[in-house]
């Protein structure tokens, strides 16, 4: 490995969740409300990439003393820290600090992070270690999916038959959260595609579609239609719960 010292502008982007269009607002608000039901005070959260996750987290304002142990730190986590929702005071490890491996967001976020004693950017081997994650207080993994089948399997990588994104640390966080005594592994997605033509809750995936998260690591599925609680349920019970959070026009 080599380290090269060079001057360069920060890589900035519109942070997911800060550019919400009015049409999507009711969906984000509904999902945020359901997430708020599942996330207890003092939980340590991991938030996967994506506009849906970030926008929905804006509705966690009533929560207290949340902590952060995540892969990517974005503007929404900065805002929740500034408003006192995130304090990191109840974390089991790295108390008082948000821990992450990457940053993705605006120039304001980079300035906020600079010399901030309340954050720690560490290597992937440390942050994504399932043992480290599982030790966190009330570890709650919140990850998005492209689609979920009626077994509860999640595809977070393929879109229209092509690789759309990588898996990242999703399996590490989901497995660790599921093994945590007070933890939760949550998958979030809209129930229907933007054009309204296709359900994101599928009877089964198309051939060749990868399973990013197996059904054993998906404990809750949240859409704007509600919460599917899958823990301890049989395949038929899981299917019934997932149909309940599908869009009404696709439930038959």
Where are these regions (language model features)?
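Conserved phosphate- and dinucleotide-binding cores of soluble alpha/beta proteins
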Residues: 1-252
């Amino acid at each position: 490995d080599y380290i090269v010292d060079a001057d360069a502008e920060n890589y900035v982007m519109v942070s997911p969740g800060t550019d919400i269009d009015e049409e999507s607002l009711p969906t984000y608000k509904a999902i945020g409300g359901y997430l708020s039901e599942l996330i207890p005070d003092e939980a340590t959260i991991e938030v996967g990439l994506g506009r849906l996750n970030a926008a929905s987290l804006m509705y966690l304002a009533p929560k207290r003393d949340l902590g952060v142990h995540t892969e990517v730190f974005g503007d929404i986590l900065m805002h929740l820290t500034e408003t006192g929702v995130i304090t990191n005071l109840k974390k089991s490890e790295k108390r008082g600090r948000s821990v992450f491996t990457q940053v993705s967001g605006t120039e304001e976020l980079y300035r906020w992070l600079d010399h901030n004693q309340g954050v720690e950017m560490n290597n992937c081997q440390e942050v994504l270690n399932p043992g480290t994650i599982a030790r966190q207080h009330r570890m709650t993994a919140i990850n998005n999916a492209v689609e979920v089948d009626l077994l509860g399997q999640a595809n977070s990588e393929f879109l229209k038959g092509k690789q759309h994104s990588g898996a990242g640390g999703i399996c590490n966080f989901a497995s660790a959260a599921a093994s945590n005594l007070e933890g939760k592994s949550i998958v979030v997605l809209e129930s229907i595609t933007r054009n309204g033509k296709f359900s994101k809750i599928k009877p089964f995936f198309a051939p060749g579609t990868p399973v990013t998260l197996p059904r054993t690591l998906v404990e809750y599925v949240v859409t704007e239609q509600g919460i599917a609680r899958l823990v301890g349920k049989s395949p038929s019970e899981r299917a019934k719960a997932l149909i309940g959070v599908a869009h009404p026009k696709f439930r038959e």
